[in-house]
């Protein structure tokens, strides 16, 4: 380990033996990572009751700048996925008429005055209908109210409220919202409005529902910060990746994490184990495991076969040979497949064990965190010492431990795919792969060693120490906390610049490293409202 990162005295520099438990039934650690709050958040949480206000804020902006009605503004925004900048760019480059046409809007054509008292509906083909039961859309097409109601009812019930087209053949015009509300029942109108409101989330690349289960009812709006992938924290406490909506997983890319979770959940490695440790009976094809040294295998179906080559044989044999049988030619392809299965199994086991070990540590350290915070608060109230009155050095160290432990756990799935052949087989030569692997593992090892030291020091009973020893512990913790933070930062820089940088990022963008942890979204509040921000510090 480099001298730059050995900044502790001997008492705090001893290595702790790793003793990770391996429980067959485990789940991800559900721990509070103390989400960061900021007055300049890169995300906002929009609660269910604020969705209308959030949508209205953008609608008003478009209505004022383009001089359009609310329903027209909403239709435009839905078509352009609520991307106001893109909408204004199309308006500037192509003009209003072209923009309207693409979105399914028409410039209103004044209705011609007619003296006819009765009219014909071209949908139901009814003649002699009174003009007052006929409704005309802005595109100019007119049909009877019963046909319109039937059309609207079907579309709303099918979930197509956001873009209900005119019934006329090949007409691409969107039906007026006010007309829809006027003709359908109040219950259906409420459902229609709910779909229009939810469109702000479901058709908006910058807003997504919180994936909490059960659903907390809130949505998260990402504020443009130059990063394609970000990790956010909802007010309900859930922290997740804004891009793929899974749990926070950096430094893994979304694709890496998806593949890793699937690999952990499915039976791919079980199949590898069976391939390595069993042979198929040549008669019934059931897998047989060898339990002793004899190469003559006997299946439950009664078939005898040779363990070495898998060929069917008779039962007469000695310890070293089978009567009337000699193994055939060297099965080169079969041996290669077996060796590959063994290699893949060993590799997966290596990375998964270390990934799981840090997850297990994270669970145990959650209990440690609670105990430490209780001690710090208790001492700040009972001891007249300045160091106890200001115990941010303890909470900072605990938060740093959790942030770095999570990063460490997910650095193993990253390494599994970064230096394997599944994703980047053709992106680098074997020599380049080995160089990059060594570079990453050196940084990973430095981070791992210092995180274990941090965990060990935090286990000390500082509430029993005298003032002088507490000050000494505070100095070491503060120093080590900064070291771990810097190592995390350097690991991310290595990944972004040295590992993924030379490769076209494509599907492998990662969320940026944030020294203070995943940022909690501030609460959206309409300008006219008097609410406060839950995420303000």
UniProtKB/Swiss-Prot annotation:
The keyword Acetylation does not apply. Zn(2+) 2 binds at residues 139, 141, 166, 171. A zinc finger (IBR-type) spans 190-254. SMART domains: IBR. Its EC number is 2.3.2.31. Zn(2+) 6 binds at residues 306, 309, 317, 327. The active site is at 294. Its cofactor is Zn(2+). Residues 1-30 are annotated as: Disordered. The keyword Zinc applies. One of its GO terms (molecular function) is ubiquitin-protein transferase activity. This is Probable E3 ubiquitin-protein ligase ARI3. It comes from Arabidopsis thaliana. The gene is ARI3.
């Amino acid at each position: 380990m480099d001298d730059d990162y050995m900044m502790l005295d001997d008492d705090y520099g001893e290595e702790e033996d790793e003793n990770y438990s391996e429980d067959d039934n485990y789940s991800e650690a559900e721990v509070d990572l103390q989400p960061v709050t900021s007055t300049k958040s890169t995300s906002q949480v929009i609660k269910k009751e604020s969705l209308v206000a959030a949508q209205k804020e953008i609608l008003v902006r478009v209505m004022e700048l383009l001089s359009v009605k609310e329903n027209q503004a909403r239709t435009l925004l839905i078509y352009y996925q609520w991307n106001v900048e893109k909408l204004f760019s199309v308006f500037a480059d192509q003009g209003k008429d072209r923009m309207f046409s693409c979105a399914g809007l028409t410039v209103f054509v004044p209705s011609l005055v007619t003296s006819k008292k009765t009219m014909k509906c071209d949908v139901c083909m009814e003649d002699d209908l009174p003009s007052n039961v006929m409704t005309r859309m802005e595109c100019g097409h007119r049909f009877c109210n019963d046909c319109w109601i039937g059309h609207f009812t079907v579309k709303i019930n099918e979930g197509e409220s956001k873009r209900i087209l005119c019934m006329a053949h090949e007409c691409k015009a969107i039906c007026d919202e006010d007309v829809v509300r006027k003709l359908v029942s109040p219950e259906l109108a409420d459902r229609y409005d709910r779909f229009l409101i939810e469109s702000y989330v479901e058709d908006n690349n910058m807003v997504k529902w919180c994936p909490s289960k059960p659903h907390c009812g809130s949505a998260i709006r990402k504020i443009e910060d130059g990063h394609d992938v970000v990790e956010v924290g909802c007010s309900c406490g859930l922290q997740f990746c804004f891009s793929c909506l899974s749990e926070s997983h950096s430094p893994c890319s979304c694709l890496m994490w998806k593949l890793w979770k699937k690999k952990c959940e499915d039976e791919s490695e079980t199949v590898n184990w069976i391939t390595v440790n069993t042979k198929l009976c040549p008669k019934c094809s059931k897998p047989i495991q060898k339990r002793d040294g004899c190469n003559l295998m006997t299946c439950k179906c009664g078939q005898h076969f040779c363990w070495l080559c898998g060929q069917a044989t008779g039962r007469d044999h000695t310890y070293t040979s089978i009567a009337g049988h000699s193994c055939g030619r060297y099965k080169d392809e079969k041996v290669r497949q077996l060796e590959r299965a063994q290699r893949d199994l060993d590799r997966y086991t290596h990375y998964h064990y270390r990934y799981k070990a840090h997850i297990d540590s994270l669970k145990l350290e959650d209990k440690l965190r609670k105990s430490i915070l209780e001690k710090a608060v208790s001492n700040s109230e009972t001891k007249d010492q300045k160091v106890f009155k200001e115990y941010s050095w303890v909470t900072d160290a605990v938060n740093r431990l959790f942030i770095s432990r999570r990063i460490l756990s997910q650095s193993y799935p990253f390494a599994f795919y970064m230096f394997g052949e599944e994703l980047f087989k053709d992106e680098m030569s074997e020599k380049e792969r080995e160089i990059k692997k060594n570079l990453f593992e050196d940084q990973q090892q430095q981070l791992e060693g210092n995180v274990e030291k941090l965990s060990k020091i935090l286990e000390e009973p500082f509430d029993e120490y005298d003032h002088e020893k507490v000050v000494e512990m505070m100095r070491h913790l503060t120093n080590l906390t900064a070291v771990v933070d810097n190592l995390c930062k350097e690991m991310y820089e290595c990944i972004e610049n040295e590992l993924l940088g030379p490769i076209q990022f494509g599907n492998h963008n990662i969320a940026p490293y944030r020294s203070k942890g995943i940022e909690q979204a501030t609460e959206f509040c309409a300008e006219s409202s008097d609410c406060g921000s839950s995420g303000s510090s």
